[in-house]
């Protein structure tokens, strides 16, 4: 699967770890940055190009990181056809529902909150869970205005 990935300085180390993990699993990873640590960088500079890339390729997904993942999801969701969901811990069912009911195509995670040892299971789950379709399709269509 083609996966776009992006972060600001807050998630740089975790992004690099996730990128290596995904590549080892055979995914094609497009890294939109950040590529070096700069505590003054701005997350929209990396997140928006990532979200645009996902919006242009319906078969791809995106993983974005930041301190909390909230601002990053807000930025990504400004792009038409993007449905970014935030996860920073808690029940795995939340991640499943983002795919089953919302067809989330970007997973936004809070690097300062999520435990690294749990992140790979969450990513694997999010990548494998299909969209249910059905009654959820009409709801998603109402979002792209």
List each language-model region with its residue ranges.
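Glycine-rich phosphate/diphosphate-binding loop of Rossmann-like nucleotide-binding domains
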Residues: 5-24
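A short beta-strand-loop structural module common to alpha/beta enzyme folds
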Residues: 28-40
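Short, structured active-site "lid" loops
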Residues: 46-64
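Mid-chain, well-packed structural core segment of small domains
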Residues: 65, 70-108, 112
